[in-house]
């Protein structure tokens, strides 16, 4: 049994990160935009030309005032715009001006929702932001329906062609010629139900506590103070006894809700829906399942034989950010420019607190055109990789104004920056070597764990309702852990219930395959950098400008990188890791 893997799987946080890029459902025409020229050296964030300007001026995050959005007013305005478009009296220019103002309010609604979530996860005991986050979540389907109704009404109006020509773009309304997602009351109810279940899961994570030796204690504190492995696992067992059934029932309801939702939207399975509507993938669930099987057969044996890295050295939050700054200065280009922007507007939180939600993510405050990094640190060198990962998302969000729609493309930048950070800091020879070995082992482990998670999801969503029980889910997860070499059969029973801590299962179904395929692409960037210094960094920068509105395989082709689905690619990866580890 791999002790490190066991600790990772059982930790009360995500294995990698809870990345949550939010997508702009409407993209105005990108104005005249050219790639900045770094041939003369560094470019300040003040001089860097971004594709879009903020709707609200750049503001340091602590100074942003949260204001509950006027949803009633927004929905009423959108309805009025639709009526004006079909009334026959308003000119296209008038409709455009009204819609442009309403769209600013729509974006502000999404921004305030993200701000509420950010501030709630920063302090899960904050009842005000918990209530605001819940309220914004509850209002989302109502707002989206109002926006969809407005688009549908404009699509049926005599101004359709003029609106497309002057503002929306060619064939924009084509997707609104048929009934929309929010026109069906049951679909709306299912979306609301999914949001409510996700909120229940987040609340369940709010510093879970258990009865221990006659009094109530925080699980995280008990685990932190466990002096022996036996005591550590005993605490975990008590935690799963207390929370496993609750989380499991939430997940079962999510699966049932999502399967019905996919069916109502015309998809054969929820995987088909997620690939098409959520993640904009240009490969199929069938391709992903074959890929995961090759991970199992080719990489699991390598992982079983690989030597585990030593326990990582300690690293404070201040040191983590210091080294991340060094890496940005060393790498230069867009990475350095984005770091200047991050510092100028205080766009990160890496503080340590028992009240913070575990894990890390990068979000986007769209009204301000500002990415934001959230990290709950562990206090080791691993935090530098986590920070680099999230900063990779930040760089992409900053350069492209959040227009990288593909999850897989987005994850290439986050994982590639982890690799590029290796050797770009003043850690010293010993700690740099320690971090590199850890990263390569972690990379191999990423393939196995995320493929394991994906296989579990596929099996869970395939279960008929009669077999969809918490006990069956535990059994399936244990089987997957054994199949992918993460545990032997004797140890799998201990890990069987740990799936409830994988937040992606609850908040981002079928997401985890992105970690596998993007890790492959990111590793290719690292290999380029190792072969020819600067080549990997150039590939990273080139891909940044290929990513907006692209898809994963198309972006890799633009960058002359090998597809992860190439038949020989998994054998190449196995050979690489055998030599590296």
Protein language model annotation of sequence segments:
Residues 348-370:
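Catalytic zinc-binding patch centered on the HExxH motif and its immediate surroundings
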Residues 292, 297-298, 400, 405-446, ...:
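Post-HExxH zinc-binding segment in Zn-dependent metallohydrolases
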Residues 386, 390, 394, 398, ...:
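Catalytic glutamate of the conserved HExxH
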Residues 368-387:
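Short pre-active-site segment immediately N-terminal to the catalytic Zn-binding motif
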Residues 37, 387, 450, 454, ...:
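C-terminal, non-catalytic "cap/extension" segments appended to globular domains
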Residues 10, 14-16:
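Hydrophobic core
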Residues 25-319, 323, 481:
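A well-structured
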